[in-house]
Amino acid sequence: MTNTKINFCGVEFKNPIVTASGTFGFGMEYNEFVSIEEYGGFGAKGLTRVPREGNKPPRIAETPSGILNSVGLQNPGVEHFAKHIMPILAEYDTNVIANMSGNTIEEYCEMAEILSDTDVAIIEMNISCPNVKHGGLTFGTDPKVVNELTSAVKKHSKKPLVVKLSPNVTSITEIAKAAEAGGADGLSLINTLMGMKIDIHTRRPILANNTGGLSGPAVKPVAVRMIHEVHEAVKLPLIGMGGVMNGEDVIEFMLAGASLVALGTGLFVKPDLILPVKQEIKEYMERYNIEDINSIIGTAVMN
């Protein structure tokens, strides 16, 4: 009998497959395609301190092997989630990973307190947000700010805190080390790569916001490389994501160092992607006589 259970930050996941925040709504939207209980856990849509309507359309643009998005964190706000959505999700046999974004350290701390009083299993902190008190620079690009933010939020969180890293940095390992030093329980990566698509007839960007985050298979090699580098640099467990489309992709991320792997853009193509992914992982384990999925984490051998 093979074991696919993963202990991540003290939380047991029945399998290593989760969803990337922003690609799975609040889970219930996918119930007509597949039960959310098929997943070890899922990343809920990103939350902010107050409700947000998001950016003006167009907000999505298809690209070769991926999509660009600038949805702008449209969401009902953390308090609405805590009072009206999480009680419903708590009835499902799966772990909920709440994702939060803030404009100030104080906002992050307030949201951590609110989410800590719910049944979420893990709090994921998106640091790819502008710090309005420091000229709008993104939180996740400065190691000192990442350390300060993580340390502050950790004091207000009763749940394991996972910091979501941006790939749009000079050195992702330095950011990872800063989050670890600040007290993070785990890390997730990668967030989207910044990109642009221009209409050659109008000479204007397709997206109303001009730029957006690139996701999908196009980013997978970058994500795998960054997972490997961060796994070598810190001792924290990792959630890997970026262009996962099948079971082989999941295995590749785990070999690079991820303990959990998130499906994201692939769900827009195949909403029930979790089903063939789980089957392919099972077949891989049987083929190579792997009894425990944990045994392959971070075992890729460099040349």
Where are each of the predicted segments found?
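N-terminal capping/small domains of soluble enzymes
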Residues: M1-V96, G102
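C-terminal helical cap(s) of enzyme catalytic domains, especially alpha/beta-barrels
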Residues: I36, G54-P64, I198-G212, M254, ...
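Short gly/pro/ser/thr-enriched loop/turn and capping motifs at secondary-structure boundaries
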Residues: T48-E53, P130-V132, M194-K197, F268-K270
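Alpha/beta enzyme core
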Residues: N103-I239, E248-A256, L260-L263
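Short donor-sugar binding/catalytic loops of nucleotide-sugar-dependent glycosyltransferases
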Residues: V244
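A short, charged, Gly/Pro-tolerant segment at domain boundaries
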Residues: N294-N303
